[in-house]
Amino acid sequence: SSRLNAEWVGFTLSWYGKLFHNEKMLMAAWNSLLIGVTASAVATVFGTMAGYAMYRFRVRLLPVLVLAPIAIPEILMGVSLLIFFVLLNISLGLISIILSHIAFCIGFVAIVVRSRLAGMDESLTEAARDLGATPWKAFRLVTLPLIMPGVVAGALMAFTLSIDDFVIT
């Protein structure tokens, strides 16, 4: 209960009460959740598409483009995105932070989804196509439910990374 770390006076929860009455801390927590949820949702959609494209089409440059944010150090990516936003006259704020987090998280989602697709039995999708399903219907009714654990895992990973990653911000 002491204001000094070096002096132990006793156990108290009073500081947590003060934390929840601090407007700046509540606003920071709200912004963090907003950024995390938005970035992970958008990164999950685009990361799933990227993972599917990397699995389905063997384009040499695609994995390099999608997975580059994973290999680049966070500080370098943060500075690069800052320069990018300034050059394009994009105002620095919540939108630019969300875009940065999306760019950072897409690669992680793509890796998880691609690995889930690699473990999937392709004959199930082929059977759906043989039975008259369109490519979209086969994807929606067969492939997507089978890769859903990977999509959810990618979304959770993206949310965790977004909440954790202060350097990109």
Predicted regions and their residues:
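Transmembrane-helix boundary motif in ABC transporter permease subunits
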Residues: 35-66, 83, 122
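Short membrane-interfacial helix/loop motifs at transmembrane-helix boundaries
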Residues: 1-23
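Short hydrophobic faces within alpha-helices
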Residues: 29, 54, 68, 123-131
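Glycine-rich helix-loop "coupling/hinge" segments at transmembrane-helix boundaries
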Residues: 3-9, 160, 166-169
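Hydrophobic alpha-helical transmembrane segments of multipass integral membrane proteins
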Residues: 26, 30, 34-46, 50, ...
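Membrane-interfacial helix termini and adjacent extracytoplasmic/periplasmic loops
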Residues: 6, 13, 75-105, 136, ...
